[in-house]
């Protein structure tokens, strides 16, 4: 089986300066309520928790998630030019879609979720993670690494320049490659190819049943971020 989907995303929500002047210090709480109400977040996750710290860019962070599964609403009430940020982590996005389908609307998709978020104001996708899963398709990370090393598979960047095998980070154990990293995480695009079955079996995950039932599972994850990688939404 080959499956394609959106794994997680980060959305930048721009400050409406006219509305900010009208509501002043209450503006961000107003937007937070709109965000929560639009997605029925309190019905699904409960009330958000204000974290006791910021992250260097935003000084106020609300988390609708739980444990290591996060859904953040971030803003900086001292630097308006930082705008606001909505972050759906992968596990939380899956849990949100599942709960929303059960409780609110069975037809919700990631695209419809993004369309609902676009009603909050001017928005831009600042990060989008795309996942392609090869389950029982016989796709091996170790085999792919060997083919890259032998130049049977050529890897190129956005400028179509060839990326040499030496610049592809290969990680594994027992003489077997289990993860490939292409480009840097800080770059506008980043590619990770890894043994998803092994990862799921090593930690708590909603994918545990799938991992236990399949023979092999390789995932390709593409991170797109920064200015030119992900465009403004026009939904």
Residue ranges and their predicted role:
Residues 1-235:
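Structured, helix-rich domain cores that form ligand/interaction pockets
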